[in-house]
Structure formats: C-alpha cells, structure tokens
C-alpha cells in the first residue's frame, strides 16, 4: 500500500525522498502543467514569500502533499478548493530548537497545542528524556512524532549527563552519539553545552564533536556567557549556532563569528525584546526558537505566532519576521523542501487573517488540514524507583551544612547560616540506587506539606520540598506510583497531583487537562505559602 503524506510526514526529508517514486514527481509535473487535476487548490491568497521578502496575490496548487504550482489566477482544477478570499498564506512555522519535554506533553499532545497556532515542524532537542533513558529516549521521541500530525525532527544530545557532577539515568558516549546521528530524522548534533570541555580539549567532548563532523550534519551550539577569544575559539571548533545571546552586543558578536543566531523566547528565558534591534538590522542568519515553553503558556499565548506578533510590533517587516520561522530554520537545518511555498516543496502552510496579529484560520501539513495524531506509543522504563530503604528514611542534614537561600522570582540561590532554614529540600535518586541527600532551605514560604517533582534539570532526579519526614516519604512514594510527575502531600495524603508517566516528564493528556492539573497543584502550593514560579 502506498503511504499517504500524513503517514510519511514524520520521517524527515531523507526518508520521504527515499519513499518517493519517479511516478510521484512525474504526476507533480503533470499537475503543474495543467495536464492533470491536483488534490488541493487554494484560491485567492496573499502568499508570503520569505525568500524574496514579498507578499503577492496567488493561487496554490497541491498534488501528493507537495506544491505543484504557485501563481495568479491559475487555470487549474483540484479535488478540493479552499477559497482564501484575500487571507494571507505563509509557509508552516518551524521551531528550530525546542525541548518538547518542557511543555510536559508527549509529541501528540504537544502537536494538539501548537498546530492551531501554525507550527508544522519542530526540531526537538530531547536531552531531557535521553538523560533518563539514553538513546532509547530519542528513538521514542521520533517514534511518538510519527503519528503526532506534526513533523518532528531531532538533534542528537551531546551532553548526557550535562556535567561530570550529575548522575542521571544514562551516560552517552561518542559511539552512541554517532548512532543517533545516523538515524533518519536526526538533523545534527544537539547543543554542545560543555564549552569548557571544548575550549579545554577534553577528549570525550572532542570525540563527540568529531562524530558530529563525520555525520556531515549541523553542530548546534550553546555558548552562554562566552565572548571575545573564547567565543572565537568555540566557533573555531566547528559549532554552527548559539541560542544563548541575551544582549544586542552578544548577538552581533555571534553573527560576526559566523554563528547562526537563534533568538530565544520561551517560558524559561525571554530574549526577543532585547535582540529586536539586531533582527531589524541583520535578519538573514537568524531564527526564532522557543527552547522551553510550558503548556499553560502555549494555551494562553500561543507558540511561534506570538513571537511573530512581537517582531512586527517591534518594527520588523512581516516577510522578514516570517522568514525567521520558515525559510531560515529550514535552511539552517538542511530541510530543503520546507519553509517556502514553491513548486516541489512540501505543502505545509498557514492561512492567516493578517500579518500583524497572525491569527490562524487553518493549518495545512502535507496539503491536508492539520490534525493531531492518535495514541502515544508505550515507553518502557523511565519511572521512579526510590529503593527499598525509602520507607525508613530520615532527612535531617548534618548540622554544619549551610542553608540554601531562595529568592522570589529568581533561579539563583544563595547561602544562609546553618540551622536557619524553614523547610528541607531532598534530592533523591530515582533510578534505583537508593541514594538521597538533603539540606535546609530558607525563603520557600512553605507552611506544612511537601511538594514533590520528578523534573530536575538535567538528570531529572526526584526533588522534594517539605517539612516532616512522613510527608517527604509519602510524596516520594506517590511519585513512584504515578511513574513521575508533580505532587502535593499534606499530612500523608496526596492533595493535588499531575501524573507524568512518560519518563517522569510528560503526559499524553489533552493540553487543557495538563494545564488545569498544573494550575491546581500550583494554586494548592500557594495556599500553603509556597510561591512556585513557572513549572514549580
């Protein structure tokens, strides 16, 4: 049986090209010549062309999931016609760097959240799940993307664990990275966070870089805080991009060094407003990415469409803004048949009300109305195992240990005098080693009860913040039963919970259900005096 475009859309450019036959392309040519009817005809659109930076009136004819012809008043017929009535037709939006796990959603649920906002493809950086499960996590992410309705590509995580001080569920070496890079749909090496290892000549890091170079694919960068000679040396190592610039000066320095500029705007870091002046002047070797974005923000604010609104409000020409999420991420990642509405390209496009608010009327993937996929495939392993000694555990830290000082709305911490804390923080190994450590904290505001979570970047151990040993133990066991997630325990009872049974990081529930559960846990924690920020 010949696969449909929806069956193939997950596979990536190389897999789709292998599955395509001469007959498919010959039919596309016949449709383009008017010798055969197409499958879809979009009449009367204002087509956004990011390559030439223009908007022009045209019809778009589609056959076999690809664009056959684009032009004004096409003398063409198709099995189905959509009347655009002057609405704008832009290429489908591409998020060039995102950790899907940070949304708390599986790929299918994530697709349900972003397809209505015009996103048709993402390049997932799955180092969260790979820290839990190793390369099997990347395999699962790609497999789960196959039926999601979204084109899910990936990059191969380069830093698992993120540092030598972390102990997670996996250690990934250069040979495993090379295997991941060889898989269809893997577009390059994921962000090389270990820049000290790059600059210091660490043998393991350079073996991984060499695996990336041998693959002939992209080497994604992560150069937080680097400048001057160090940034030049990092670029000289062969990295191609960076998404850590926070100031216009840093952004320009990266562009001068030959790096592609990924401008990050998500839930954890928001750099777009600061970098808009650079995008206005130098919009060509740049792309917009979300990096980490939470489910509640996806539902409330949107995805790449909200970044486009910010760009246009900040003075970018709409075609320049659209290029940042279409042709330019496609060019960077080598997705040569995405990002433009042109003959031979995949028929991924978005019908928009206007080019100021970017309200989405309809999203098309492979020439069909986008529809989120079906069931999420099972994921063996990746749960929580605190070990048999947990039930008798006590969590008082040594008296001379310093207290961890927390600050409202900050991710930085400080030190306070020993014995000055108001709640204990326990970090417990979730991978069956039966280990844990604890310290006192000051500034959490928590009055009674315990918060527990299995999301702890990047090793994703279990973190518990609370008072009594009994509640700390109960919260840990609750996370075990759920297979991971977020819980709030008071007097030994679970008051609120968000199960995340996929690697302790994701749920396959509908986005609205996941956001509601997250909201209930957060609200309950605030009632107990704790003021969790973001995703707790």
Curated annotation (Swiss-Prot):
Q: Which reaction does it catalyse?
A: adenine + H2O + H(+) = hypoxanthine + NH4(+)
- EC number(s) for this protein? 3.5.4.2
What Gene3D superfamilies does its record include? Metal-dependent hydrolases, Urease, subunit C, domain 1
Show the segment(s) annotated as Disordered.
1-24
> What Gene Ontology molecular function terms does this protein carry?
adenine deaminase activity
Biological process, per Gene Ontology = adenine catabolic process
Cofactor dependence is on: Mn(2+)
Query: Which InterPro entries does UniProt cross-reference here?
Result: Adenine_deam, Adenine_deam_C, Amidohydro-rel, Metal-dep_hydrolase_composite, Metal_Hydrolase
**Which keywords are on file for this protein?**
Hydrolase, Manganese
Keyword Transferase among record annotations: no
Pfam families from the xrefs?
A: Adenine_deam_C, Amidohydro_1
Identify its protein family: Belongs to the metallo-dependent hydrolases superfamily. Adenine deaminase family.
Q: State what protein this is by name.
A: Adenine deaminase
Query: What species is given as this protein's source?
Result: Deinococcus radiodurans (strain ATCC 13939 / DSM 20539 / JCM 16871 / CCUG 27074 / LMG 4051 / NBRC 15346 / NCIMB 9279 / VKM B-1422 / R1)
Gene name of this polypeptide: ade
